[in-house]
Amino acid sequence: LVVSYDWALGGGNLNINLAGNYTETKITKFNFPEKVLASHSQDEFFGPDQINIIETLSPKTKASLGLNYKINKFNFLVRNTYFGEVIRDGFPFGSVQKFAPKVVTDLSVGYDLTKKINFTVGANNLFDVFPDLQVYENSYFGVFKYAPVQMGTTGNYFFGRLNYNF
């Protein structure tokens, strides 16, 4: 669901964008040929780890609220994105782990150098939000501090961008 509203405000234009979704994924049936299952286990092709990736490793809920204000040659963006809880089962070793919901904030400021060229600076994941730490046994024995769930594992990054509109 996406709702967007434009509002003339203070000589500029404020765009308010609200988006959200709820997704529930459940595998209900496998359709392997009988000849294959006669000599192989279903888990060899599609085991508990693959089922977990599809059913629980993506958040069921995700929502975003973005505010984009444009006035004269400037534009300002602030966006908060909510990522819901996810569950990792730890297969083939480890344990079940729930990862708490997180909110990530993006911020940018842009300036129109010409009618066709815009320069923007900003930050994605401004407050350096990370997923919960993995329990030791799920981290491949300390190799991976974070699971690649919800919003990723790279933390914040800052950028400069030059856009040309054709």
Can you say where each PLM-predicted feature lies in the sequence?
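Gram-negative outer-membrane beta-barrel transporters
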Residues: 1-90
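C-terminal beta-signal and adjacent terminal beta-strands/loops
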Residues: 24-27, 81-89, 111-166
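Extracellular loop and loop/strand-boundary signature of outer-membrane beta-barrel proteins
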Residues: 48-53, 91-97, 145-150
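A short, compositionally biased micro-patch
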Residues: 70, 102, 112-114
